[in-house]
């Protein structure tokens, strides 16, 4: 008896949606497979849930699976699952006559420029089949109904027929896509495997692909010879047996066989208990996730339960990628799943920029499937997930720090990220600060933490001292450290460009203020005798300070007697809230710097002179004798320019500085000035350049 076929009209909105999908060009059509596999996974979830209370529900088909069958002969691709299936009314209602609330919203989102890949979020993922197919046939069998076939070419209507003659499914759904002529790539085994791995690798049911295997078999012509024997019986030749064996023709025949190939071999590792997973399994998962050829350095596997549920596995690689801070590169190190379905791998809201090197996956039970980027920015669930991820990452770094060798590797690769964290993450700043490591005046070749520094602080020392500069070599003999070293205070060497930014935010650690050795406001404990001596020297050198200020003009803001320099004649310090010499150097190196900021941030310098230094004492005597003495002015300018260099600044006019040095050399070697008068005619008069700043403005 022929089955009756019923024809139904698509509901108006669904018709509109189909028209949009078919007639608009979308570049990422490949998402259809993700959507259909996701639907299969949902159907399997439903039957698995029903079977918990009634095992007989699985009798018709005990195995839970998803099968993908490409058929090049008919240009069809079938997705088969042993899920819950659909009754006739499910078919009619779900696939065409009742518009889901999401249909209209999805079309509005598409019109507003949203991506077609969001389709599943609106509950209409099935229709993505029409991105690649001109005709779709759905065969389905529910435990409570007979087998039915739904069919449509999306021309405004669909048909539903009771299936009596077709292959019986037992239970489940088979979707057959009759592919468009320009979409036949989806019949290729490699393409399908890549797609399943990309989008559906961690679906919790086995996804098997029907693959074709062609093997070549090489056989001798024995079989053919038997057939020809009768015809050739009369032609007998005396041929050497061995020769005949050699010359016997070989024949290649192709054998074609088909078999199921399991694609999602990687079981969702995050669904298992951490204690059950071996180091090798984590390593294999890490490599499959990141395509890294090395194993990871550390892993954190955890789940959060309660009002919000998600599971995550986070990895720290052994080395930093070459493009770690490439701002043009999309961050795609954390893959976001929702209930085992891959959603996206470049979700910027999931993890802050300073943790961009951490790789892994997050699987949420609460986020809606296929959540859009716009919704992500507002999503409260995601904000909670992000907060937890940051917390767990910091915990992981502390775990790495327990092994000194591992932490050294980690710190070498990712210290800049931690410092960026100090700069950007006010919530976790104090915690991240404990992870910082620096060389210091007392640490030798080892790195020291701020915590260790605090334990070594001298009695009466209230602040943590640091110096910033270009390199350890550049700062370890800096004049700024002389007094601090003499008093036995430890000074941290901050020689990474990003240290300047980090320390700008990290004002203190464990209640101890971080104080720069190169800025104003360095106050060191002094005895009464020291204070008295300082006042006397201040008075004694007051005249020289005025002379130096007159000579240097607006190159310096003021000239004072120093209590930080012990051996050097002088140094140049910057304002407490302005840029250090090192920061000025960094800002000059910025090709696209903001020049408006430089004017007020590159603060005026204060020249601090050392009254105990023999050069300064001699200069004082000469200035007291005659403040217009030409040699005094020349010496002051030379000392200033030398102090610029030793204090970490750059010279605006190195040629003039060189000429001054040469003049001093001549004096030292008693070379008569008249002999070289001609050569000196180009030298600028010392008095004229006194009022002009020779420092390059940082613009």
Swiss-Prot record:
The keyword Transport does not apply. ATP binds at residues 39, 81, 126, 373. Residues 672-690 have a biased composition (Acidic residues). Keywords: ATP-binding, Chaperone, Cytoplasm, Nucleotide-binding, Stress response. InterPro entries: HATPase_C_sf (IPR036890), Heat_shock_protein_90_CS (IPR019805), HSP90_C (IPR037196), Hsp90_fam (IPR001404), Hsp90_N (IPR020575), Ribosomal_Su5_D2-typ_SF (IPR020568). Pfam families: HATPase_c_3, HSP90. Belongs to the heat shock protein 90 family. The TPR repeat-binding motif mediates interaction with TPR repeat-containing proteins. This is Heat shock protein 81-1.
């Amino acid at each position: 008896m022929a089955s009756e076929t019923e024809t139904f009209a698509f509901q108006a909105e669904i018709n509109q949606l189909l028209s949009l999908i078919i007639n608009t060009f979308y570049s990422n059509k490949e998402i259809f497979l993700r959507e259909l596999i996701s639907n299969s996974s949902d159907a399997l979830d439903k039957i698995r849930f029903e079977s918990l209370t009634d095992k007989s529900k699985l009798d018709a088909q005990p195995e839970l699976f998803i099968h993908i069958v490409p058929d090049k002969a008919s240009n069809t691709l079938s997705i088969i699952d042993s899920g819950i299936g659909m009754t006739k009314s499910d078919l009619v209602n779900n696939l065409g006559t009742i518009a889901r609330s999401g249909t209209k919203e999805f079309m509005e989102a598409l019109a507003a420029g949203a991506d077609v890949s969001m389709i599943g979020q609106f509950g209409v993922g099935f229709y993505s089949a029409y991105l690649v197919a001109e005709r779709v046939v759905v065969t389905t069998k529910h435990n409570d109904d007979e087998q039915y076939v739904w069919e449509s070419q999306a021309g405004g209507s669909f048909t539903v027929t009771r299936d009596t003659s077709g292959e019986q499914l037992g239970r489940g759904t088979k979707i057959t896509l009759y592919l468009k002529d320009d979409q036949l790539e989806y019949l290729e085994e490699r393409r399908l495997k890549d797609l399943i791995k990309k989008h559906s690798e961690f679906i919790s049911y086995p996804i098997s692909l029907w693959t074709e295997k062609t093997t070549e078999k090489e056989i001798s012509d024995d079989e053919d010879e038997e057939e020809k024997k009768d015809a050739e019986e009369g032609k007998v030749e005396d041929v050497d047996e061995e020769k005949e064996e050699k010359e016997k023709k070989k024949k290649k025949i192709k054998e074609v066989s088909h078999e199921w190939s399991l694609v999602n071999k990687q079981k969702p590792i995050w669904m298992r208990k951490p204690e059950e997973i071996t180091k090798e399994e984590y390593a294999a998962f890490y490599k499959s996730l990141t395509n890294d050829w090395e194993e990871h350095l550390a892993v954190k596997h955890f789940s959060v339960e309660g009002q919000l549920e998600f599971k995550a596995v986070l990895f720290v690689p052994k080395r930093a990628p070459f493009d770690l801070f490439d701002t043009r590169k999309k961050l795609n190190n954390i893959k976001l799943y929702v209930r085992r379905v891959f959603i996206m791998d470049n979700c910027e809201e999931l993890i802050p920029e300073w943790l961009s090197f951490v790789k892994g996956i997050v699987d949420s039970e609460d986020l809606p499937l296929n959540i859009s980027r716009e919704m992500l920015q507002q999503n409260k669930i995601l904000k909670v997930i992000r907060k937890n991820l940051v917390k767990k990452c910091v915990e992981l770094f502390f775990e790495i720090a327990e092994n000194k060798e591992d932490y050294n590797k980690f710190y070498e690769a990712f210290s800049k990220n931690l410092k960026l964290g100090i700069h950007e993450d006010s919530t976790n700043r104090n915690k991240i600060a404990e992870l910082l490591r620096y060389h210091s005046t007392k640490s030798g070749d080892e790195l020291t933490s701020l915590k260790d520094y605090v334990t070594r602080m001298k009695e009466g020392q209230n602040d943590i001292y640091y110096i910033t500069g270009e390199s350890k070599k550049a700062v370890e003999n800096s004049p700024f450290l002389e007094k601090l070293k003499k008093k036995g205070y430890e000074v941290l060497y901050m020689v990474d460009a990003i240290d300047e930014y980090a320390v700008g935010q990290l004002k203190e650690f464990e209640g101890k203020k971080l104080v720069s050795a190169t800025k104003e406001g360095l106050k060191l404990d002094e005895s009464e005798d020291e204070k008295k001596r300082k006042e006397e020297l201040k008075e004694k050198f007051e005249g020289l300070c005025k002379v130096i200020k007159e000579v240097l003009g607006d190159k310096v803001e003021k000239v004072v007697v120093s209590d930080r320099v012990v051996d050097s004649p002088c140094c140049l310090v910057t304002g407490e809230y302005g840029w250090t010499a090192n920061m000025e150097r960094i800002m000059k190196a910025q090709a696209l710097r903001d020049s408006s900021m430089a004017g007020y941030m590159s603060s005026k310098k204060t020249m601090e002179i050392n009254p105990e230094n023999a050069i300064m004492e001699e200069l004082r005597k000469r200035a007291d004798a005659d403040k217009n003495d030409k040699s005094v002015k020349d010496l002051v300018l030379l000392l200033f320019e030398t102090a610029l260099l030793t204090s970490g600044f750059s010279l605006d006019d190195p040629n003039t500085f060189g000429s001054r040095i040469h003049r001093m050399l001549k004096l030292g070697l008693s070379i008569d000035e008249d002999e070289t008068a001609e050569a000196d005619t180009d030298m600028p008069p010392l008095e004229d350049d006194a009022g002009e700043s020779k420092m390059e403005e940082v613009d």
